Amino acid sequence: MPQQVRLSRENSVKRSRSLTKSFRGLFKFNSPGSPPSSAATSDSSEMSGAQGGRGNGLLGGRTKKASISPKSEAQFTQRNKSAESVVSDEGVAMVASAGAQFYGRGKHESSPNVLMTGGEEAARAAGRASAESIALSEGGPPSIDTKLERVTPSLIYPQNGRAKHSSQRSRSASVGRNKERGGPTPAPIGSIREEESKKAHKCIIQQEHFTVDENGNHQHSLKVLPLIVQDPESHKPKLFSFSAVFKSHKNGEDEELSDAFSILPDYSTVLEKTLVEPLSEVKIFSEAAQPDENGGRTEANQPKDMPKIVNKHAAIGNEELKLINNLSETIHVGMQGPDKHSSPPQPFTCKATKSKQVLAEKYGKCIGMIGQGAYGTVWVTCRSLPQDNQTETHYPTETYERNGKLFYAIKEIKPRADEPNEKFSTRLTSEFVIGHSLSGGAGGTKRLTSHPNILKVLDLMQAHDVFIEVFEFCPSGDLFSLLTRSSKTGSGLHPLEADCFMKQLLNGVRYMHDHGVAHCDLKPENILFTPNGTLKLCDFGSSSVFQTAWEKRVHFQTGAVGSEPYVAPEEFIPKREYDTRLVDCWSCGIIYCTMVLGHYLWKIAIKEKDQIYSAFLDDMTTRGEYYVFENMRHVNQEVNRCRKMCLYNIFQWDPKKRITIPKLLDTPWMRRTKCCVNYRAAI
């Protein structure tokens, strides 16, 4: 059996993408057709080209549809007489029965730290549930196969018959705030579900940070950074942090960051002038165009050749393009100024307005550093709640709150020693604008609603030659740290916990795709958590804008982007264009398996370079199944079978056969998964 691949942070293929390549196809308005060919590839194309000899033989010329199992459906039906899933939307069955079924197989090696209570009652419940399931099988509702054929037309079945097509439900995630204010308030959309009854239910599954009661309701209790738990006024530089690195802030660095000011334009005031110089690649504004007396543009001065908006839901539209132009100029001036230690001139000036607030006034003082890498340093700031009717425009409150204090994460970004100023400017602008737009924007760019599973990007500031991004703060760290702590016990996460996180992950990714952006670097390090288990996607520096507001069709890209264990196989094929949405789907599957198993599926999806991935391809082409997926267990056999089918359809090395994110969310596995975040369906 191949050796397991241990978790590691050192596996990056590419960490950033230039703005112009992220927006490849911007203002190329050809007639709809096949994806445009790109002469210019990403920086990682050189690396993938070097791997060309290994990537060409990726599939070995052998393809075969993946089946769930070689065993017959009759055999499966005979043994699959379990109680209704505890995560079913149709009705909550007894978790005691499901728990007895799952843990009654013997001492499962992957769950040594699970405690069960109420053994005698569980046994009686299991007997009753078994009898009920037998009665249902004799004349009850349709089987799981019928449900699968009705709702998952894209899934690949072992039978020759094709699944019937069905329309997809149109759904969208709602806006929600992630606060932990005291007092009994109604749960807003996107927040943790409130219990319908205050009656205490018996806990039947209890882990360090995850519990499930007898009604099937679960609760996450993730650890909070000790830096936040203790008094921010007296923190000590010796405790746990996200990346296992903690340092107390230095006085000099603290003073430098505290003097930073926002470089975002103030849309609430009348502007004396606007930036009219666009990006060199995009000539869109007329030089004669000037703002009218109300700060807008007159009909005579509207931008020339402005393309028509055909996709109003896209994250990148007219307002974002203006912001890109503004920030590019501001950053460029700040980096090229004669005196880098003086405040650079601002492209926007306002009439009779207050001076811009510095970081210390707006977001509080730095209380500690929680991460450091080649691309920047992450700090935590703390301030008291706004007073005197101060508004969110000046004091954003959509962040973590504890004991009357707001906490923010700030990322200090400097250009690398060998990085040209122009490249640094486009990298920083791309990362900020994409994240800022997806998190709802602000002021004049507030077009989209925020999503509970997208980390909010609040501000971009400058202190001399240093630039600072401001985010909402997630005090429970990232998924990588959670998995690292869990793997020390010899197991991954509980299946119900992993399912909840998977559903949140897929909803966040679908929101990005619905707005024309693919993440392209999904991995545990880019998944953050709040203490109540709300998942947040972050780090949009490698994201690809595959469709803007002016484009009717999706464009593809080439070159490997991301971290090797999570990169889809088609990315390693030189000069091959691929759909970034399907790449994200592959990465989500890898992340889920990593959560359940506690280790990577493989190190890299290249047959000639990775023995485990090669064995996966051989097993799938010869037997139609993979032993890792076959050996996975769940609390319910039907859910386990649905999950297994989904995994086989996620890990289709031919992207044309791979399931999409919306269809994956519409499978019985995900629809029957209880998620601790409320999503409102849009009809």
UniProtKB/Swiss-Prot annotation:
Positions annotated to bind ATP: I370, G371, Q372, G373, A374, Y375, G376, T377, V378, K411
Kinase as UniProt keyword: yes
Enzyme class of the recorded protein, top EC level: transferase
Compositional bias annotation for Gly residues: 50-60
Record field: compositional bias (Low complexity): 36-48
Keyword Transferase: yes
Domain Protein kinase: 364-670
Any single GO BP term: intracellular monoatomic cation homeostasis
Catalyzed reactions per annotation: L-seryl-[protein] + ATP = O-phospho-L-seryl-[protein] + ADP + H(+); L-threonyl-[protein] + ATP = O-phospho-L-threonyl-[protein] + ADP + H(+)
Active site: residue positions: D521
Coiled coil: none
Enzyme Commission code: 2.7.11.1
Region: Disordered, residue numbers: 1-90, 157-200
InterPro entries given in the database record: Kinase-like_dom_sf, Prot_kinase_dom, Ser/Thr_kinase_AS
Keyword line: ATP-binding, Kinase, Nucleotide-binding, Serine/threonine-protein kinase, Transferase
Residue ranges with Polar residues bias: 69-85
One Gene Ontology term of the molecular function aspect: protein serine kinase activity
Membership in a protein family: Belongs to the protein kinase superfamily. CAMK Ser/Thr protein kinase family. NPR/HAL subfamily. HAL5 sub-subfamily.
PANTHER family found in the cross-reference section: SERINE/THREONINE KINASE, SERINE_THREONINE-PROTEIN KINASE HAL5-RELATED
Protein name, UniProt field: Probable serine/threonine-protein kinase HAL5-like
Taxonomic source organism: Eremothecium gossypii (strain ATCC 10895 / CBS 109.51 / FGSC 9923 / NRRL Y-1056) (Yeast)
